[in-house]
Amino acid sequence: MALRVTADVWLARPWQCLHRTRALGTTATLAPKTLQPFEAIPQYSRNKWLKMIQILREQGQENLHLEMHQVFRELGPIFRHSVGKTQIVSVMLPEDAEKLHQVESMLPRRMHLEPWVAHRELRGLRRGVFLLNGPEWRLNRLRLNRNVLSPKAVQKFVPMVDMVARDFLETLKEKVLQNARGSLTMDVQQSLFNYTIEASNFALFGERLGLLGHDLSPGSLKFIHALHSMFKSTSQLLFLPKSLTRWTSTRVWKEHFDAWDVISEYANRCIWKVHQELRLGSSQTYSGIVAELISQGSLPLDAIKANSMELTAGSVDTTAIPLVMTLFELARNPDVQKALRQESLAAEASIAANPQKAMSDLPLLRAALKETLRLYPVGGFLERILSSDLVLQNYHVPAGTLVLLYLYSMGRNPAVFPRPERYMPQRWLERKRSFQHLAFGFGVRQCLGRRLAEVEMMLLLHHILKTFQVETLRQEDVQMAYRFVLMPSSSPVLTFRPVS
């Protein structure tokens, strides 16, 4: 059985403990039949001062996904609330995601991620596409798409990712052979975290970091610590106004800026090295995304650096966590794992000859990743600032309103996904599911690193499944915590046993 939340959730209003929160059912309030004004949208009101105290005390908002899930159960598929002067409308149905996409302009707007923006402003650095809006965003994005998202770009970096995935497999084999029991039981999360850094760095900068071995360099350890620290501090600062946290969270702000400084210095060094190699003409073959961007000269170096920082930071947890949760669910669902192994073994010859075949010859594995991201959406929610008026659930929503689309609640709605508590990859192969797989966003602002993440996950899972049986003694659900990304509050322990 997949996720069935059993954690106690403390809501800001009312302050009550909710036991055994269930998936959102079909008992939600139906949308009105005639068009209603914005003010008629069900309102979620909470005491903002009590909420601030709660966030300060808990150093974040780890149960955000559960809190919002319960509000949908109480108020229906749409509700509104305000944060300061900002009006926010929250939705969770695929039909509303489709409407958001239909009215999307050429310049879709997102809200600012204040902790990240504050670092760029303080250090005088440019912003990448994750932090930009308007014409500058579009200019950067169109030039990046060609080298990061396009099929031609994917074809170029797939062999690099496959090399790292195969090295991970060999390292895992070595550890298993060293164990007298002929198997290996471990918390795999940090190893997968290192894999995603290694693979992303190789695809971006054409450089291996050596993170799959036993002895990591001090520089590598510093970089890994900076990535962890950046995400942790982001979640601690995200839900409170800067005017407050500058006094209450000075240590956290320092940790946040220090972490970004390490990431910035790392990106600087990598880009300088790539630039020097290009000037010397030492590389005549494809050597990564950044080398292509510099060679084309369509973006200035500081813009390449800004986007490299964001791709580096954004391609780690968002890939490692789905890998962890997929392996855990396959360990709990051995029949699904067996079917995936048969698929991988049948496709091994074609994938060995051309690693890109993994993206087309493993449909059940692709479905398994969709099922993992249905249950454990790393981002938790998508957001758009409306550029024009829109009708959602027969309520008028004016232009300029911030709309949040909660993927966690969509994935647990039995009206959308029958038996949502079950891990059933086959559901994605039975029929087309429009606007139901949104873990990477939608439209022209979908995740820039989507294809890189998919390649990293597909290739590694293929190599693991054809070689190892993955097992776990744990049958209960893993509790998730919102720490800027949705991640396991404690990582599951898995056993890797060679396939006989």
UniProtKB/Swiss-Prot annotation:
The keyword Cell membrane does not apply. It is an enzyme of class 1 (oxidoreductase). It catalyses: a steroid + 2 reduced [adrenodoxin] + O2 + 2 H(+) = an 11beta-hydroxysteroid + 2 oxidized [adrenodoxin] + H2O; 21-hydroxyprogesterone + 2 reduced [adrenodoxin] + O2 + 2 H(+) = corticosterone + 2 oxidized [adrenodoxin] + H2O; corticosterone + 2 reduced [adrenodoxin] + O2 + 2 H(+) = 18-hydroxycorticosterone + 2 oxidized [adrenodoxin] + H2O; 18-hydroxycorticosterone + 2 reduced [adrenodoxin] + O2 + 2 H(+) = aldosterone + 2 oxidized [adrenodoxin] + 2 H2O. GO terms for cellular component: mitochondrial inner membrane; mitochondrion. Its EC number is 1.14.15.5, 1.14.15.4. Pathway: Steroid biosynthesis. GO terms for molecular function: corticosterone 18-monooxygenase activity; heme binding; iron ion binding; steroid 11-beta-monooxygenase activity. Its cofactor is heme. The keyword Metal-binding applies. This is Cytochrome P450 11B2, mitochondrial.
